[in-house]
Every structure is written in structure tokens, then in C-alpha cells.
From Swiss-Prot:
PANTHER family: HEAT SHOCK PROTEIN 70KDA (PTHR19375). Pfam families: HSP70. This is Chaperone protein DnaK 2. GO terms for molecular function: ATP binding; ATP-dependent protein folding chaperone; unfolded protein binding. Acts as a chaperone. Residues 600-634 are annotated as: Disordered. Keywords: ATP-binding, Chaperone, Nucleotide-binding, Phosphoprotein, Stress response. The gene is dnaK2. The keyword Transferase does not apply. The modification Phosphothreonine is found at T197. Residues 600-620 have a biased composition (Low complexity). It comes from Synechococcus sp. (strain ATCC 27144 / PCC 6301 / SAUG 1402/1).
Amino acid sequence: MAKVVGIDLGTTNSCVAVMEGGKPTVIANAEGFRTTPSVVAFAKNQDRLVGQIAKRQAVMNPENTFYSVKRFIGRRPDEVTNELTEVAYKVDTSGNAVKLDSSNAGKQFAPEEISAQVLRKLAEDASKYLGETVTQAVIPVPAYFNDSQRQATKDAGKIAGLEVLRIINEPTAAALAYGLDKKSNERILVFDLGGGTFDVSVLEVGDGVFEVLATSGDTHLGGDDFDKKIVDFLAGEFQKNEGIDLRKDKQALQRLTEAAEKAKIELSSATQTEINLPFITATQDGPKHLDLTLTRAKFEELASDLIDRCRIPVEQAIKDAKLALSEIDEIVLVGGSTRIPAVQAIVKQMTGKEPNQSVNPDEVVAIGAAIQGGVLAGEVKDILLLDVTPLSLGVETLGGVMTKLIPRNTTIPTKKSETFSTAADGQTNVEIHVLQGEREMASDNKSLGTFRLDGIPPAPRGVPQIEVIFVIDANGILNVTAKDKGSGKEQSISITGASTLSDNEVDRMVKDAEANAAADKERRERIDLKNQADTLVYQSEKQLSELGDKISADEKSKVEGFIQELKDALAAEDYDKIRSIIEQLQQALYAAGSSVYQQASAEASANAQAGPSSSSSSSSGDDDVIDAEFSESK
């Protein structure tokens, strides 16, 4: 069976892993790194850049460099108000869906399309490593992702040309990686603070069984928020001193964001860091520079509210699991933001335990996804994963109330049904409004979609019996069916959420991505051809110089002619001609080289024939003969 990879599509960085020889292996990307920045950019010539190369040019191209896209995926425009102020690129929220605007590409992209580019790169890098095309993947998502966000992640995989075999929760994936070899039963709390989201899951792990007891989280809390605290501090100090708000300058904002991330990382190991941003802006008085010292204590003061927000999901998960903190055996830290000392301190303070840091927080989720991929591919045996749905699911009933059919933390896959009736005499149809959330009123919860059941025979109110069935699959994705028991009429909906893409949009994006992949391949081949031609020109000129008079004037002229033709073809970017002349130039060089060897061979042969007569005449005298004296060693 083909290999199934695990891809951790992170807010800040992404990672891919695979099972090899019964063990999970992290696959380095084409650049040699084990993680890849989740960044996609469009250059002025419309070239698409992904990963490290995209991140490096962000300062010079802030409006066409897309990062932290995971915070927009599967969300409606009214759900991303806070995120809009944290990015330098333009986010269009005027329609029914969030769109990311690229002036260089001349079009708008859905967040799923941008995420798909990161997934495609990781899949291609994995394909090169494995020597076979990767088409199947397991993709983890934050445990607190709602149905729309899960479906959107699956759509991103489809656009990338991947069959997403399973969507699993990130803390659960981390627990798989941590507990793969655990024999004794342990209760573990996974504290997953990534770049854009925060999850807490409580699990029982042992003898190959991974049972999620409860999960909680905050999808608006992550490393990006810590960065923003530093950005606001730097911008505020600069505005205080210079009267200029750097946040209004896209390029300056991008530089501040990069400096903030760097400072945050440095403060995990140092007690203070210098932030120097020369020429951050300019006025009529000349250039302005930003030069500040940020201490760890000041950073912790700035981020104190964020650190406090970490408490609530931990307390909620423990409560839902019906456990006391003293009953937790291990605290496993996941996500790059758990390297922040203040975060580690609050975990220790809350639990009274030293956090377990035996796993790499940047790689553990991808490793767990690879293990799940191994389970699905039949490579890994004797593992049972029992995950849960993070939020309650239900329908709107009379009076605008949410009636829950599936409570949060229900083990999945699951199926639940409830029988409802009509609210008016003679009512022949009902509208089913599907909701997700914990509030009592329907309007306070997340709307996942609506559908109508028609053809109900007229009857007094309360008489018709309408069965509503909720089915959650192993991916945590919901299907809802409504059936009138009297007439047998049935209607169903696969919930995709108002903010995600229609099937037609996904299909179009898949075709666009395939076309772009072909264009990218052609562009890469052209670059490789130009590089090959440039190298050949250099080597040919060097070889002619070294050979000098050893080749005939005709051969030299022929090679020089092809070199000039190749230079002209390169200037004109005539790739067919470049290909043709490369071949002709190589043949001319081979011919010139052969003639030099033939000439050298002929000269050596002539010298060999003349050699014996000259040597015998010179040896006839004994003027040059030296007698050696030997002494016998005893």
C-alpha cells in the first residue's frame, strides 16, 4: 500500500512525517529543514513562493505575503475581526466569505487555497524523499476547531491533490507520539499552545488504547498574540518618541512583526534582548531608527493577560474529564509557544507537576499524524484511538432555543437521533437549523447550516413525527438527516458551514492548483535549463582558454560560434533554441577534446619509437654511473 504521510499544517510552521520500518520519521524539506514556514507569497512576476523563500522576502513584499492563514480558514467574515489588525496583507470581508487579496497575482484567494500551497510543497518534498508520489495524508487540526474549520482543512487537502484519510485532533496526535510505547496506563494532559490556537486535552493512554476523556481550547490564542503584544509595545514606544505610528506602514509593520517573533524566541533563553531596526521609517528630517531593549520581565508583563487565558481551558478540560489535577500523571507540552518560560511556569503552578518536555513541540503533532497514517495503512497494529467532539451539536427549536443532540466530549464516531414535531396546524414543511456551541440560545451559537424537509402531510400541530439524526464521522465532520416518519420523506445535509467552499469552488480550485503545479514545473525546468546553459558557457570559455593552441583554429571557431549562439538564445529566452544549442556545443567540445587526446597520443607514440636509440647511446659511457656501497647488517 502507498505511504500515508502525517502533515501538521501549523499557523506559523508546518511539518511532515511518515512511518518507516515501524517508526515515525520527520521528513526534511527541499531546503534541508525539518519544519517549513506556513507562508505563501506572490512575487511581482507572479511567481508563487512557498516556505522559507516566501518568508525571507516578506519585508519587501508585505501585501503579497500570506502568513498565519490558519486563523482565517473556515471562518466567516464576522469571526475574524481581531485577526485583521495582525496581518500586513489585505483581507476582504465584504462578501459572505473571507478572501485574501494579492495585487501581484491579480486575484483573491480563499484561505483554503493558500493553505493548499503549503500542503502541496510538503507532499512534494515527501514524495522526493520516499521516491514515490504521496497522495494520501492524515492532517491534524486544533481540537477546538468547529465543523466548518475541519471541513475547510479537508478542502485544502483536496485542493493540494491529497486524499485526506483522516482529520484528527492535534493534542490527540501528540498523545499518540508520546504514548506509542507506553505499556502502563497513564492519564495525561496535553497542553498545546501553537502559533494561532490553544488546545487542552485529557487522555487515558496505555497498551495501545488512546482514549480522549475531554478537550477544551481557545482558537483565538497563540504565539501570534504574544508577537502582537511586542509589536504594540515597540510601536507605542516609537510613537511616544517620534510621533509616528509604524503600524500604519505595511512594510514597517512586517519588520516589527519579524523583530517581535525573534525577540520572543530569544527571551525563552535570555533575560533580555536588543531590538534594532535601522531606517524603520523616514521624515523630512531624515531616516528614523528603532533601538530598544526588551527584558523578559517586561515581556511577561505585556503578555500577562494571554498567560492568564491559558488557565480557563485547563480547568474546563479537567472538570469535563471528572478528574482532579492530582490524578493527572503527566503534562505534555506541545507547540512552539510552550517554550515561553512564563507559560511553563503557569502550567507547573496549576498542576503542581514539572511539565514533560521529552517530545519536540514542533514535530510531535506530525509524528502522531504519521502514526495514525500507519494505522490506516495497516503498518501499525494494536492501536485504538477514541477521540471526542469538542463542542455540542444540536438544532434550533421553538422560541429560538438550541436543543442539543450530541453533547461536547462525546466519543466519535457517533450517531444520535431525536424526534420533533410541527409548531403549527397544517404545517407541511420544517426548516432544520443546525448549530454548534454551548450557549442556550440558538443566536449565540455557531450556525453550521440549514435545510428544509418538505412534503409533510397536513396534520394538527404536534402530530407529525420528524426524526432528526446526527452522525459524526471519525474526522469529526457532521452529517444531518431529517425524516418524516409518517410519509417516509427524507432530506439530508452534509454540513460544510456557511464560511467554507461549495463543491464547485473546491473543484475549480483543484483544477487551478493542478494548472499552477504544471506551470510551476515548467518554470522550474526553464530555470534549470538556464542554469545549465550558463554553466556550460562558463566551462566552455574556460576550457578554450586552457587548451589554447592545442586545438585547431577551425575547432576553436566552431566552439566560439556555439557559445555566442547560446548567449544570444539566453538573452532572448528562447528555450527550444537553448536546448538545441546546448547539445551542439557539448558535441563540439567533445570533438575538440578528442582531437587533443588523439594529438597527445600520437606524440607519445612517436616519442616511444625514438626512445630506445637515445637511451642506449647515453648509457654507453659510465660518466653518470654511481656505484652504491652496501653494508650487511648483522
